[in-house]
Design a protein with these regions (language model features):
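Membrane-interface "cap" regions at the ends of multi-pass membrane proteins
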Residues: 1-28, 57-62, 66-78, 85, ...
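Membrane-embedded translocation segments of transport machinery
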Residues: 2-7, 11, 173, 177-336, ...
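Extracellular loop-to-transmembrane helix junctions
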Residues: 5, 34-60, 86, 148, ...
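Transmembrane helix-boundary motif of multi-pass solute transporters/channels
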Residues: 10-49, 202, 238-246, 255-257, ...
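Transmembrane helix-loop junctions in multi-pass membrane proteins
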Residues: 24-33, 40, 160-171, 192-204, ...
Length: 509
């Protein structure tokens, strides 16, 4: 009889998977990416990327986790004993991401409090970088811990680890059943209010107006695949880990389609809310929408506070709802990211879940303090860029090449998925994973290595954001390399006797 933890309901798994996929990037990255790559026309390559890469990869990872019944390292180990390193590489990437992702949630938590009295004032940019983050003058200087970031960071980790302490069914599932509906309701309120503001229609027109000439640009297709890839929590152990908690008779392909389209639906909702608000801001300042469009940290913590300042009424409430939505979206993702190494450490060393949460989550929480210092924003910016581009995207390419091309595991994985799923996998799935996905990811990685190694960014020194070489090497390349090296180091340690004994695994019937 299987002793592995399980989700209590199918809805619980879907909420958890969607909660992992829906994160900060849905709100602050997707709208700007869509606008810059053809507006309404971008949805053509975006949908194509979802159907030919996003959902096929979700199905692949759901099937691996469900078939081999383990964390990413254990699942790959059971697939092929020489493949354990790939799982640990993904887990190491997840660990790095959790250390700085938690800090962004802490910022959002602080700003939800600032919303009540519009504490950021009129100069929202000066407040963020000066008064709140107390950003140091030079890259590379750590500086002191910023109390306004550190205190909410402690709260974020207390909530996340407290949920993980309670386990899969009573912790992760229950939390996502509360957080995801709350997130959707809150964001619907934001969108409804935003589209009724003066200038909202101009913002939506800018967002949806198609520029079909962009479709002929290969970079637009790469942007679409990149958005899908980074948005769905693919290739850093999450979906493999979560699907290993599914009951034996679970519809894998259906769950993948629901997760993929659920995530994309929220991205579209976020785009509507963001651009309606940007349209209002543009009109109130006498500017065009193009002049106020931004993404990332600037959109969330500089532009949106400016928008909230201009609201005709209920500024504080709208601000609180917006930043509360960031907190909820961030927490559901942080929980899933942390679960990857909690599960892996527990299985590898044969320790209890609670000890794994204390060890893995506690270590991540300690490391995250680095990003709560005066130079934390710069450390975060570089680490995030390099671990995503040369961690997540690169390991995704390697995952597909190894599993599909070298080990030729698609046939047994297809048979497993088809046995328990309503939507049967056919030749389309093999073509997507065997040809389309590796070609697009390969092209994307070639471009990324080229622009970074040859220093082709439009900055004074050619580096990403113009950072000094030493800072790029230590906070960027070294972090990405650390994840890969850690992946190989963890394979040296034998699995716990309990896990080793079970590694003549029972195929899921």
């Amino acid at each position: 009889m299987e002793n592995r933890s399980q989700f209590g309901t199918r809805a619980g798994f879907i909420m958890a998977a969607v909660g992992s996929a829906i994160g900060l990037g849905n709100i602050w990255r997707f709208p700007a990416v869509a606008y810059e790559n053809g507006g309404g026309a971008f949805f053509i390559p975006y949908l194509f990327a979802l159907l030919t890469a996003g959902i096929p990869l979700l199905i692949l990872e759901f099937t691996i986790g469900h078939k081999y019944r383990g964390s990413a390292p254990l699942s790959y180990f059971r697939m092929n004993r020489k493949l354990e390193w790939l799982g640990w590489w993904q887990v190491a990437i997840a660990f790095v991401i959790s250390t700085y992702y938690s800090v962004i949630i802490a910022w959002a938590m602080s700003y939800s409090v600032f919303s009540f009295n519009l504490g950021w004032g009129d100069d929202t940019e000066g407040f963020l970088f000066g008064k709140y983050l107390n950003l140091s003058a030079e890259a590379g200087q750590t500086g002191s811990i910023v109390p306004g970031v550190f205190i909410p960071l402690v709260i974020v980790w207390a909530v996340a680890l407290g949920i993980l302490f309670r386990g899969v069914k009573k912790g992760i599932e229950v939390a996502n059943k509360i957080f995801i509906p709350a997130l959707v309701i809150i964001f619907l309120i934001i969108v409804i209010r935003a589209v009724t503001l003066p200038g909202a229609m101009e913002g939506l027109d800018a967002f949806f107006k198609p520029d079909f000439s962009k479709i002929a640009d290969p970079s637009v297709w790469v942007a679409a695949y990149g958005q899908i890839f980074f948005s769905l929590s693919i290739a850093f152990a999450i979906m493999i880990t979560y699907s290993s908690y599914l009951p034996k008779k679970s519809d894998i392909t259906n769950n993948a389609f629901i997760t993929g389209f659920g995530n994309s639906s929220f991205e579209l909702l976020a785009g509507i809310g963001v651009f309606a608000a940007l349209g209002f801001m543009a009109q109130s300042q006498g500017l065009s929408v193009q002049d106020v469009v931004s993404g990332g940290v600037g959109l969330a913590f500089v532009v949106f506070p400016q928008i909230i300042n201009s609201f005709p009424a209920l500024n504080g409430l709208f601000g609180f709802l917006f930043f509360a939505s960031l907190v909820l979206a961030g927490l559901t993702s942080l929980i899933s990211i942390t679960e990857t190494y909690v599960a892996a450490v527990s299985e590898k060393f044969g320790i209890s879940r609670k000890k794994a949460v204390l060890f893995g989550g506690g270590l991540s929480a300690i490391v995250s303090i680095l990003f709560a210092t005066q130079n934390g924003l710069r450390f975060l910016d570089v680490a995030d860029y390099f671990i995503n581009q040369f961690g997540v995207a690169f390991v995704g390419l390697i995952e597909v090449i190894v599993v599909v091309w070298f080990l030729r595991k698609l046939n047994p994985l297809q048979a497993h998925a088809n046995e328990i799923s309503d939507i049967r996998l056919g030749a389309w799935w093999k073509v997507c994973l065997g040809v389309i996905t590796p070609v697009v990811l390969g092209f994307m990685m070639f471009g990324l290595f080229k622009i970074n190694l040859l220093k082709q960014f439009d900055t004074e020194n050619g580096n990403y954001e113009g950072y000094p070489d030493m800072f790029i090497n230590l906070s960027g390349w070294a972090v990405a390399a650390f994840a890969l090296v850690l992946g190989f180091l963890f394979t040296v340690k034998r699995w716990s006797s309990k896990t080793e004994a079970d590694t003549t695994y029972k195929e899921v019937s």
